[in-house]
Amino acid sequence: MTKYTFKPKNFKAFTVDGLDARMEALNERVRPQLNHLGDYFAQYLETATGEIFYPHVAKHARRSVNPPKDTWVAFATNNRGYKMQPHFQIGLFENQLFVMYGVMHEAKDKAQQVQAFVDQFDALRNLPSDYSVSLDHMSQEKTYIHNMTDEDLFKAFRRVKEVKKGEFFVARTLSPNSEHLKNDKAFLSFLEETFEQLLKFYK
């Protein structure tokens, strides 16, 4: 029995129709792992940074009609919420597991927060080839950093500063059949390796 990782059947929770039925499927097939990952990586981040991190598992409480197309656990140093500050996420869509760190459009002082990526531009450029950028946390679409020009990246930074909906996340993704998801040991190793890279941009 696995505690942390996700199998293809877990991703299938997103194929269940209807809000109530999908929420029930997510609560049964996905939320237990997110809760365990929340506890594990809150401690991991505290050890790595010396700061206390709080896990926030998505509840989707505001939804009344449309079922969620993704779900996640987020990590931030604020125990009341995470959207207002740069934060880490582990989550999944039907066809993608994602690990991200960045700035959401709701964040306070977005222009100042995205500056961490500008200041660490060389580190961003030198990330392994499977790292990507997400400009919208609600979309599965992400662009590999090695396929982006410097101008593409600086345009993305400017968008965060100038556009209300502007966001910037550095991400790493897996398909549901990835070898990194075959067992807890492989998955935790993948996640720790990813967090180690993402922490380069944490101030």
Swiss-Prot record:
InterPro entries linked: UPF0637, UPF0637_domain_sf
Signal sequence, renumbered to the chain: none
Pfam families associated with the record: DUF1054 (PF06335)
HAMAP family, per the entry: UPF0637 (MF_01851)
Membership in a protein family: Belongs to the UPF0637 family.
The protein's name in its UniProt record: UPF0637 protein SSP1683
Higher taxonomy: Bacteria, Bacillati, Bacillota, Bacilli, Bacillales
